[in-house]
């Protein structure tokens, strides 16, 4: 509730004509100074707002707030987004999900379910996926694989981690076509399966080295002689 009050206050200050008082940028207690107002005005007109919300009622409030101020918004979290999927589809607001968020971690996610992504897609909502914290980004394809296992269409899943994020956040199109940057990954099998690995990574048309700390450790500790000395030899 306090966050909504601050947001409403910030947007109200953009339209206020007062040169003094609470809304004035010259007031030491004003929420936004002139630079802050300029930044908020620019973001609200051309930027994208990401609201973290899981509870259905909070998602509805985001939709109402975005419509009131004509904002381009994205829902992040969305554990109960399936409950308000028709409203999300009508508003054209994308949802960023973790497909493994099927158990409530708080009262905000009591309605969490594994087929959340499938229900949203069926209703026409644009769905993206996240693995949560950044150090688990390598597990994103496994997260998406779980969404597919619970009804999310396979081709939509591949798009949800390639072309859809680029379209939502304004990146270059993630398509294979003449004239586009050659950013490709060649997999040993289905990229959404846990036993598949990247055979080759191509970035901007150049082959990326496939060595990493993990592959170097594998070479060092394999039982066969591979030319690398062991880090520690027991006496």
Which residues make up each language-model segment?
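A general structural motif
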Residues: 32, 51-55, 77-79, 106-113
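Histidine-anchored nucleotide/phosphate-binding helix
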Residues: 63-66, 79-83, 117
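Charged, amphipathic alpha-helical linkers/stalks
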Residues: 222-225, 230
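His/Asp/Glu-enriched, well-ordered alpha-helical/loop segment
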Residues: 48, 86-89, 94, 98-187, ...
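Short internal beta-strands
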Residues: 74-79, 96
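Active-site environment of divalent metal-dependent phosphoester hydrolases
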Residues: 56-60, 80-85, 136-138
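Polyanionic/metal-chelating signatures
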Residues: 1-73, 197, 203, 229-235
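C-terminal cap of metal-dependent C-N hydrolases
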Residues: 177-221
């Amino acid at each position: 509730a306090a966050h909504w009050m601050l947001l409403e206050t910030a947007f109200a200050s953009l339209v206020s004509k007062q040169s003094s008082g609470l809304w004035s940028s010259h007031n030491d207690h004003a929420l936004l100074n002139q630079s802050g107002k300029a930044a908020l005005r620019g973001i609200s007109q051309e930027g994208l707002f990401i609201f973290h919300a899981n509870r259905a009622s909070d998602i509805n409030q985001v939709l109402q707030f975005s419509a009131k101020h004509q904002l381009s918004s994205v829902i992040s979290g969305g554990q109960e987004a399936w409950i308000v999927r028709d409203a999300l589809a009508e508003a054209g607001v994308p949802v960023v999900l973790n497909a493994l968020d099927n158990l409530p971690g708080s009262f905000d996610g009591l309605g969490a379910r594994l087929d959340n992504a499938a229900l949203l897609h069926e209703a026409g909502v644009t769905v993206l996926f996240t693995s949560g914290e950044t150090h688990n980004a390598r597990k994103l394809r496994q997260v998406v694989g779980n969404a597919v296992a619970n009804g999310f269409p396979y081709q939509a899943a591949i798009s949800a981690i390639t072309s859809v994020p680029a379209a939502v956040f304004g990146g270059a199109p993630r398509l294979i076509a003449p004239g586009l940057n050659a950013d490709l990954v060649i997999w040993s099998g289905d990229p959404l399966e846990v036993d598949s690995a990247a055979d080759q990574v191509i970035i901007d048309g150049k082959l990326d080295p496939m060595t990493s700390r993990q592959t170097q450790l594998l070479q060092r500790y394999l039982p066969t002689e591979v030319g690398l000395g062991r880090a520690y030899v027991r006496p």
